[in-house]
């Protein structure tokens, strides 16, 4: 078994648990309200096995005060006993997650093709609209800039937990030389965070309240649907490499979180599984993996794991090369 613990989502099978299910102890915080840590693995079963191990309040991190008792979850065992069918499952296709202008047509097609395969497993599929989904990136960006700047400047307070004092000692105080050597995204957080705090006092609280509103909207949907689906990222992975200008360094990541940032805000669990290939933007002869994001209600990891595991059991994503001409 090959697994690692990551923050947010990445390539492979990535699982972002409900906020607070996994303690954040020992991980550098961006914003305690949106901090999530979870497994990155080769399969859904491996991710579930890792989640069983790392879940539960550790007696240190107050984010996890509402979590389960360590060692009490049985996500992996439930998958191993499952018959890999989804009879009675209701799947909602979030149209805002597919129809955003940033979503590449190849990615949209590949994920929509994968979603339709849930029908073969016994699930019913419906389109659902949630306009508030589109507010997620703006809410998350503001929170990350303000809270991130406070953290980077050593001004984060108000948590019961383990503070990373060794890291703070190495980073602080900021000097001009240290700031110039920082990655452009770090400079972006500090400059924009300070600007927002100075020009828009009280803005962080407004975004926090708006985030609760969006979370409630999603919870209402989960009274009707077992899972919601959409592309994980709007495009396949951009070309990696050093870029000369700061803006060029930031540009490849712009817009990548249009479907993921909102669930950092709301705290809902989300699973990303690979469902095929689509051509790279820089070279359409290069085919790169496409991820489908499966989202569940708060503390409903079992449902998203079950859906991901069933899809994996019946379909081989490595053979699925999406072509607009053929679909």
Kindly label every feature range from the protein language model.
Residues 53-261, 265, 279-284, 299, ...:
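Amidase signature
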Residues 301-304:
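Short, conserved charged micro-motifs
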Residues 273-278, 295-297:
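Short, loop-centered acidic/histidine patches that primarily coordinate divalent metals
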Residues 14, 90, 189, 291-293:
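Generic structural signal for residues positioned in beta-strands
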Residues 1-57, 265-275, 288-291:
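Short glycine/serine-rich loop segments
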Residues 35-42, 192-198, 293-296:
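Short, well-ordered beta-strand elements within core beta-sheets of diverse protein domains
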């Amino acid at each position: 078994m090959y697994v690692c613990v990551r923050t947010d989502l990445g390539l492979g099978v990535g699982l972002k648990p409900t906020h607070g299910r996994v303690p954040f102890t020992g991980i550098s915080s961006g914003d305690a309200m949106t901090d999530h840590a979870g497994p990155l693995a080769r399969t859904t079963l491996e991710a579930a096995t890792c989640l069983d191990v790392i879940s539960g309040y550790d007696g240190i991190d107050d984010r996890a005060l509402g979590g389960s008792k360590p060692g009490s979850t049985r996500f992996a065992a439930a998958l191993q006993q499952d018959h890999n069918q989804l009879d009675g499952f209701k799947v909602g296709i979030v149209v805002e997650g597919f129809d955003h202008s940033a979503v590449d047509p190849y990615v949209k097609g590949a994920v929509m093709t994968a979603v339709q395969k849930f029908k073969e497993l016994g699930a019913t599929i419906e389109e659902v609209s949630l306009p508030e989904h589109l507010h997620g990136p703006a809410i998350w960006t503001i929170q990350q800039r303000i809270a991130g700047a406070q953290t980077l400047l050593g001004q984060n307070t108000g948590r019961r937990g383990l503070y990373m004092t060794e890291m703070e000692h190495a980073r602080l105080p900021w000097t001009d030389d240290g700031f110039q050597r920082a990655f452009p995204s770090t400079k972006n957080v500090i400059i924009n965070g300070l600007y927002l705090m100075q020009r828009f006092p009280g803005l962080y609280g407004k975004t926090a309240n708006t985030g609760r509103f969006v979370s409630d909207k999603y919870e209402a949907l989960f009274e009707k649907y077992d899972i919601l689906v959409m592309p994980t990222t709007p495009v396949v992975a951009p070309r990696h490499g050093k870029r000369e200008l700061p803006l060029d360094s930031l540009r490849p990541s712009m817009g990548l979180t249009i479907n993921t940032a909102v669930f950092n805000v709301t705290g809902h669990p989300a699973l990303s599984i690979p469902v095929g290939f689509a051509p790279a933007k820089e070279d359409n002869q290069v085919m790169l993996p496409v991820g489908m994001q499966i989202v569940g209600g708060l503390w409903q990891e079992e449902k998203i794991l079950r859906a991901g595991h069933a899809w994996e059991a019946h379909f081989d994503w490595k053979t699925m090369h999406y072509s607009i001409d053929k679909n």
